[in-house]
Amino acid sequence: MSLSVRRDGAATWITLDRPDALNALDGPVKEALAGALGEAAGDPAVRAVALTGAGRAFCVGQDLRELEGGYREGRAPDFAAELERHYEPICRLLAEMPKPTVAVVNGVAAGAGLSLALACDLRLASSTSRWRLAFSGIGLVPDAGSTWHLPRLVGLSRAMEMALLGDWVDADQALAFGLVNRVWPAEDLQREAEAALAALAAGPTLAFGRTKALFRDHLGTDLTGALAGEAEAQVASGQTKDHLEGVTAFLEKRLPNFQGA
């Protein structure tokens, strides 16, 4: 199998599992990833989703060997069709599903692999992780949502540097840039990430989903629009069982037991 899925309580872990190819994305992997993400997004019992890679890489992006035959004949792939069929649905699912998504970056994240990590809500990384927006090295522009996500995370100047120069970024730099949220020693990453996923999966899932939508929607709106969107989402959140449980737990001086409802 080129991809594995496991449940850990209310969290789903999706692992890109082509370690010998550094988890490069070929057709079967992309199809399986889209299917796994769609299933997790639609399952109310899943309340947080982690994406990681097997072996020493997170993901090095598109598997160019899959396209080698066409290139040797002087034919470039149909990029519009490829992006529409595979990368756009995957990135939309990671970014827009109404529950937290977390990239657990255990090693190299490059090209479209970096784009996948950017589409997640949080990025937790190993101290040995390395990052590269590698598109310019093969004469392409960044895709799979990276031109939208990257400048919003690290700023326009830093995004331009990563895109145009194509330098490797190590874990400490990634943390300083705001590219990742937290970095741990390699031997601690899985344990710490599992704890973070468990905490997210135990949280107020509906409120998390609305928070995601508000942050993303309001990046392109004015204050008036943001205030209106917040009010609408708050009315809906205020009617949830999780809200009542949160307030009750606060008044009773105990931890809340959120059910994602």
PLM segments and residue spans:
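Hydrophobic alpha-helical core bundles mediating ligand binding, dimerization, or RNAP-core interactions
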Residues: E84-C91, L197, F215, L227-Q234
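Histidine-centered beta-alpha loop that forms part of the nucleotide-sugar donor binding/catalytic region
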Residues: D17, Q62, N106
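Crotonase-fold acyl-CoA enzyme core
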Residues: R92-F208, D222, E232-T240, L244-T248, ...
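Hydrophobic alpha-helical membrane-association signature
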Residues: V29-A32, L83-H86, L189, E230
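Short, charged, surface-exposed hinge/linker loops at domain edges
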Residues: F215-T221
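Conserved CoA-thioester-binding segment of acyl-CoA-metabolizing enzymes
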Residues: M1-A54, R92
